[in-house]
Amino acid sequence: MNSNFNQHFERIKELRALLNKANYSYYVLDSPEIDDAVYDQLYRELIEIENIHPSLITDDSPSQRLGGVPSKGFKNVEHNIPLLSLDNAFNLNELESWYGRISKLISSENKNIKKVDDLELICELKIDGNAISLRYENGILTRAATRGDGKTGEDITTNIRTISTIPLRLLLENPPSWVEIRGEAFMPNNIFNKLNIERKNTDQPLFANPRNSCAGTLRQLDPKIVASRKLDFFAYSLYFPENWEPTDNNFKKPISQSESLEFLKNIGFKVNTTYETTKTLNEANKYYKYWEVKKDFLAYATDGIVVKIDKFDIQNLLGATNKAPRWAIAVKYPAEEKATKLRKIIFQVGRSGAVTPVAEFESIELAGTSVNRATLHNAKRLASLDLHYEDTIIVRKAGEIIPEVIRVIKEFRKVDAKLVQLPQNCPECNSKLILESNEAITKCINYGCEAKLKGLLRHWVSKGSMNIDGLGEKIINQLVNEGYVKSIADLYKLEIDSLLELERFGEKSANNLLIEINESKNKNWHKQLYGLGIPHIGEANAKSLSNNFNSIEELNAIAKESPEKISNIYGFGNEMKDSIVKWFDDSNNQTLIKELKAIGFSLKESLDSNYNSNQSNVFDGKSFVLTGTLDSLTRDEAKELIESAGGKVSSSISKKTDFLVSGEKAGSKLNKAQELGVKIINENELKLLL
């Protein structure tokens, strides 16, 4: 019996290796090594042995591609390395602008690069699919996740195993302890067309496009359905431990994106071989124009190209923003356009009083979605279109996301059609509108305009500011319409009896909302500042202001006495400076500041957000990881504290981690930190260090 088991053990290893190699040759190299009959015979033998000895079934067995029992749902998993998006360019001029910016940045940081021509670029097709992160441990696929928000995605490992072009085991001797692969899952055009024919024949709604179809397939709870739809995958990047070196002489550690693609192909992945390397922007432009014509002949959907700095050392020099790497940009192809009939124009009033015309038209399909409205932006844009009621208009989706009216077909215009004009009075409060001389924006300047107030309140309770989840748009509208709230400060004067008079409020929900509103007074200074809704001041700008000015009083004084100090802040300019000065000049805003301070807002830097301004770089060069639930800080707040003191917060533990900040219900990171000898501290110890 033992002898028989040992024979089966050795044979099953041999079968797995033969079948995995055959899959790689067939699906990735498109060069079958064995005929189908031999493959079927080997596969049948594998299944027979696994049925006899279930303990010999491994994650990298070809039998596991078919998937198991249907899942009950998808759990969220944290990306060890953030899965960032790319910044977009919508024409070659914007590509040139990006190229110029990074060239200057690189030249200033690296004196060995003296001119633009020294930059090596790589151009790749932008596959119109779904970004996927794959994690391999000791060479075996252990997890696959969707992009999600870039930090956290959904675990779809079972479904990803069904994709034949994704290896279950890397073709690499002595692989590193972990490898992360990034790539694009997609549905080939012929599979998409076949699927829609089947759905039409069975009276099911059709999928709008291959991307949506792929996304829906990956979220199927039954992996057998996923397997039947024959998704495909292109790998485009990989990450591994810095100290790892290949032991196989046939492999060289990649030092560029182009070498990385070759490496990926050699370890078992399918890569898109249409990429090209170049040293000139002109050649990148030619690549873009070539595939703009040829893309419709491809077997898969592509919506543009991606241009990257090829060398990893230059990529590292450029780094990334919170959302995207600086060393890459996606250049989108022109959007799809369609004609439709204009039905009406509505005029929306924002929190700053800006009146925005919005076109409503007969519904059309653009880039796979139904569209029936689009913003016309401002008076200048409206005038340039020469838009008349019931015009036939051309609508496109910019970047396949935002619909826009690009022109009018005047030949179809009725003789008696009326010109669309901005109203002279606010559509909400009937106050006189003004067109500010330095802007193309028509505004309502009535501080008491309810539409402005509702917009400001929505901004104040948003995630980037007070983050009051219980105050949605419908509740805000009720509070304003009933006269309970006439300013931000009035939110903090609400009583339970007033809330109970509103729709869908019981005593418990009313109490919970009042508690949440009251707790928001403790938010950090930069969140309070952002919530005030100063025009042109976004969340990142508010944070920069809070880093330079410790209180609303200091910022107020600077705005009046030395406004140039504002425009001198990195990333600021005269427009932002003027907006801040104008905001503080408004007596209504001065009244709001007094009201907020009277009800308990500090409107200044607190000890929790700046323990010692003289030690702002106390964590310089130190690496932190957060785990569990902290006592008084959210993870984002703890991260802000650490980064403001010069530290770096990572999502995964390694030997290079200096501190693990641990809270309640700490997970596996705590165990790993103990194994690696990483110093473990709690929230109070973090505050003491600060």
UniProtKB/Swiss-Prot annotation:
UniProt gene name: ligA
E.C. code: 6.5.1.2
Coiled-coil parts of chain: none
Catalytic activity: NAD(+) + (deoxyribonucleotide)n-3'-hydroxyl + 5'-phospho-(deoxyribonucleotide)m = (deoxyribonucleotide)n+m + AMP + beta-nicotinamide D-nucleotide
GO MF annotation, one: DNA ligase (NAD+) activity
Active site: K126 (n6-amp-lysine intermediate)
EC top class, as a word: ligase
Family indicated by similarity: Belongs to the NAD-dependent DNA ligase family. LigA subfamily.
Lineage: Bacteria, Bacillati, Cyanobacteriota, Cyanophyceae, Synechococcales
Protein name per UniProt: DNA ligase
SS bonds (residue pairs): none
Keywords attached to this entry: DNA damage, DNA repair, DNA replication, Ligase, Magnesium, Manganese, Metal-binding, NAD, Zinc
Names of the cofactor(s): Mg(2+); Mn(2+)
Binding of Zn(2+), residues: C426, C429, C444, C449
Residues engaged in binding NAD(+): D36, A37, V38, Y39, D40, S85, L86, E124, R147, E184, K308, K332
InterPro entries: BRCT_dom, BRCT_dom_sf, DisA/LigA_HHH, DNA_ligase, DNA_ligase_CS, DNAligase_adenylation, DNAligase_N, NA-bd_OB-fold
Function in brief: DNA ligase that catalyzes the formation of phosphodiester linkages between 5'-phosphoryl and 3'-hydroxyl groups in double-stranded DNA using NAD as a coenzyme and as the energy source for the reaction. It is essential for DNA replication and repair of damaged DNA.
Cellular component GO terms held in the UniProt record: cytosol
Domain annotation BRCT: ranges: 614-690
Pfam families named in the record: BRCT, DNA_ligase_aden, DNA_ligase_OB, DNA_ligase_ZBD, HHH_2, HHH_5, Nlig-Ia
Example GO BP: DNA replication
